[in-house]
Every structure is written in structure tokens, then in C-alpha cells.
Amino acid sequence: MRVGLFTNNYLPFRGGVTTAVETLRQGLEAQGHRAWVFAPAWRAPHDDPAFVFRYPSVPAPTYPGFALPLPFSRRWSRAARELDLDIFHAQHPFLLGVTARRLARSQGRPLVFTYHTRYEKYAHYVPLPEPLVASLAVRLASRFAGAADLVIAPSARIAESLADLGVKARIAVVPTGVPLDLFRPGDRGEARRTLGLDEDAPLCLYVGRLDREKSVERVIGAFGSIALAVSGARLLLVGQGSHEVALKRLAVASPASEAIRFAGSVAREELPPYYQAADLFLFSSETETQGLVLAEAHACGLPAVAVRASGVDEVVRDGETGLLTKADVEELADAAIGLLLDAPRRSAMALAARALAASDFSAARQVEVMAGHYRRLVGGPA
């Protein structure tokens, strides 16, 4: 099968959509299919492999470091025709997503759309009234989904919300998987030595973008209480984003400031030692469609304390692989303190977390499921 993946963000930009696209591309290639990525040009010169086609782009005015593709290119439209793609898979409902739809329709090929993002939660990036932008975003995304031949939802809750919005297209739940050979339990002491971390300190970890919608300030606030209750506790935050400066100011003002460290952006293939070194994963976002970093943490045998929210509660099994709380700093802190002080319970959750990741979030298995959907669309055996 020959698949075109059309995305508004891709490497070297890091985020959930980029990870999902690259996981799918690698998995398809590993299973004998061919996949090409159509993405915006990066802001700096960047060497790309032959499977990447870059559209001209402009800097996003409200998100430093993000490029917005100009979704018109005769050259790449011609390339898409010459590739003789079987499937056009859009990752967004606008810009290159619209390009994917146009090319799919002109060539009589199926259009697949993955609903990666709760777009109404990102309205603050558009310099217009947030309620207006949020409403328009929901309408645009649901209309685009309704025109697709298949809509992929990363979680059952997202599938339900799309149906509630009146999307009539067929919807399939296919979460982004985790490469289990990369993300796996490891030696905690060795991981800490590799990263230059104290081998004995109780370590809390956050991995993800440092953007407003991720509510990382709640993690930092909770850690202030954690540090008072758990002797020697440390917090390590991995990632970068538009809210980073504000979060660093918040960390400096925290009574636990000396115990908080920002590690910056880390390539996905270099993340496993961070998960392996930690004792507990902290997560407070309420805007996820899946919560991929939670699946990565679980694959490494790391339990999580997270705010109960759509997508998150389909990865973290409350009381089994971690704990889910209300969106409250002290409740988040209390749950984390309880687990940090209960090593046997944490160990049991670690085993359950790895088992859950292996059964429900294997990248190889999820790509196989996706390929089955592709085959049905082109009329082949599932």
C-alpha cells in the first residue's frame, strides 16, 4: 500500500502529532508498505530523507518556532499524482489537510482524517475572541471529519464527542502506539547515572510541551507540597514551549525551587532513560485526545498521577496503573505523596502499567490495525 501523510507539523518540531505521524510512517514501512510525509518547510535549513516533501511555510505569528505551511504547490501536487497514492491521510482539518482532501478527491482516492487535537482548547493562539475561535474550530473540524471516508479517533471519548457533534463518517478508534522495544523498563540506577541525577532522591517526572494548554503550572504547584512531605524529592520537566519562561519564573518562586530542574527538549528516541529514572509521572493536562506520554511512561513501567480528563482516563487506569485526580493542585499533590511513600504499591502499579502498554498501546499492533482500515477502504482484504 502507498500512503501519503499530510501534516501541518513534523520533525524537527516535536509534539504529539509529529510523534504520531512518525510512529505510523515507521510502522507502515516496517510492515512492507510505503509512506510519504507532506509537511511545512522548517524555519532553518534541514536535511530531509527522500520520503519527505516540504511545502513553503511562514512563521506562526503567535507560536514561536512553529511554521505554517502554504498549502499550494504544483510541484508537490504533481509528485503526489506520480506517487500513485492509495490513501491520503490528513492529520489536520486545515492547511495541508485541505490539500490532502483536494488531491484525494481529484484522484478518486480515499481520504482518512485523524482527529489528533481538541482544537477549541487551542483558541488562545489565534488573536481573536477565544469563544468565537473555539466555536469556529469545532465547526471546521467536524465538517472536515464529516467529509472524510474514515475518521480516526485516538480514544473512545473522542469518538463519542465526534458522534455527538453530528459527524456521520465512519469513525474508528486507533490510539497512537508506543514502540515497546524502545520504551521498556530499565535499570533505575543506570538511567540516573546516565542523566547525572541523584541515585537516591524520589523523582517526579513531566514530559511534554511547556504550553499553556498543558497546565504544567499545576504540576509545579503540586510539587511544592510534595517536596515538603517527601524528603529529598525532585521534579524534572522535559520539553519546551511558549509558556516555558513563565513556568521557569513560577519554579523560581516555588519554595521547592532548588529541587526543580528543566531538561529542555529531548528527542523521542532519547526519552526512555528519563522514564526509567523516575519514580512517578505527573500530568495535569485536560486537553488531550490520548495522552501519548502517559503510554510511553507506562511502557517503561512508570506509574502516573494525572488529572482525570478525556483521553487520559483511557491510558491511566485509576488505582491500577496510577491515580486520577480532580484538576486541583492539592489533590494532585496528595495522590503523588501517597504513592511516593508507598513503594510496594508503586511497584505493583509499575508491573500493571507495562502490561497495559503491551496489550493496548503496542505501536506494531496499532499500525497493523490502521493498515487493516486502509485495506478496507481500497477494497482489499482486512
Regions picked out by a protein language model, each given a short descriptive name:
Residues L294, P303-A306:
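Short hydrophobic beta-strand element within catalytic cores of glycosyltransferases
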Residues A39, P56, A134, V138-R188:
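Donor nucleotide-sugar binding/catalytic pocket of nucleotide-sugar-dependent glycosyltransferases
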Residues D198-G224, L236:
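Conserved donor-binding/catalytic core segment of Leloir-type glycosyltransferases
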Residues A145, S265-V266, P273-A278:
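Short alpha-helical donor nucleotide-sugar binding micro-motif in glycosyltransferases
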Residues E286:
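Aromatic "clamp/platform" in nucleotide-sugar-dependent glycosyltransferases that forms part
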Residues A246-V266:
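Nucleotide-activated donor-binding/catalytic signature segment of Leloir-type glycosyltransferases, i.e.
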